[in-house]
Amino acid sequence: MYLNATILGQVIAFILFVWFCMKYVWNPLMSVIEERQKKIIDSLESIKTSKMESERIRNEALACLKQAHIKSEEIIKYAYECKMQILHTAQNEAYQERDKILSQTQIQIDQERERIISELRNHVSKLVIESTEKVIDTSINKIIDYDFVDKIIKQLSNYED
């Protein structure tokens, strides 16, 4: 195989091309590739960190929701207890008011009964006196009538006491 000038020229041109590429193209190209790789690695780490952070925030949110649920149950329980206490208090007050009204009504009934009994006694006394006067007027024997009148007066005085 003969080495001629064309092949030798092509080898020299190729070597110069490789040297030129290594000196002016390869370094910037490799730095761009390395920079891109570094950005990709940083992005992956950032994604991993963000994923961990989002998981932490999610867990915090779940814990917060549990606390809110527990607190809402406590509030509902407290409201129920307050409702029951208010109902119990209102019921006791209603019973007290009922007892007060009943006692006042009983007092009024007793007073009215006493008043009516007193009026009836007075009315009966007047009737007895009137009837006694009529009997005395029509009676023949006045001594018996006086005894009768005294007896009625004593009975009436016993009723009034």
From Swiss-Prot:
GO CC, any one term: proton-transporting ATP synthase complex
Domain of life: Bacteria
Single Gene Ontology MF annotation: proton-transporting ATP synthase activity, rotational mechanism
Keywords recorded for this protein, A-Z: ATP synthesis, Cell inner membrane, Cell membrane, CF(0), Hydrogen ion transport, Ion transport, Membrane, Transmembrane, Transmembrane helix, Transport
Sequence intervals crossing the membrane: 1-21
Statement: the UniProt record of this protein carries the keyword Transmembrane helix: yes
Subcellular location per the Swiss-Prot or TrEMBL entry: Cell inner membrane
Membrane topology according to the record: Single-pass membrane protein
Family matches, as SUPFAM superfamilies: F1F0 ATP synthase subunit B, membrane domain (SSF81573)
Record flagged with keyword Transport: yes
Principal subcellular localization: membrane
Role, per record: F(1)F(0) ATP synthase produces ATP from ADP in the presence of a proton or sodium gradient. F-type ATPases consist of two structural domains, F(1) containing the extramembraneous catalytic core and F(0) containing the membrane proton channel, linked together by a central stalk and a peripheral stalk. During catalysis, ATP synthesis in the catalytic domain of F(1) is coupled via a rotary mechanism of the central stalk subunits to proton translocation. Component of the F(0) channel, it forms part of the peripheral stalk, linking F(1) to F(0).
UniProt family annotation: Belongs to the ATPase B chain family.
NCBIfam families assigned to the protein according to its UniProt record, in alphabetical order: ATP_synt_b (TIGR01144), PRK05759.1-2 (NF004411), PRK05759.1-4 (NF004413)
Record text on subunit structure and interactions: F-type ATPases have 2 components, F(1) - the catalytic core - and F(0) - the membrane proton channel. F(1) has five subunits: alpha(3), beta(3), gamma(1), delta(1), epsilon(1). F(0) has three main subunits: a(1), b(2) and c(10-14). The alpha and beta chains form an alternating ring which encloses part of the gamma chain. F(1) is attached to F(0) by a central stalk formed by the gamma and epsilon chains, while a peripheral stalk is formed by the delta and b chains.
Full protein name: ATP synthase subunit b
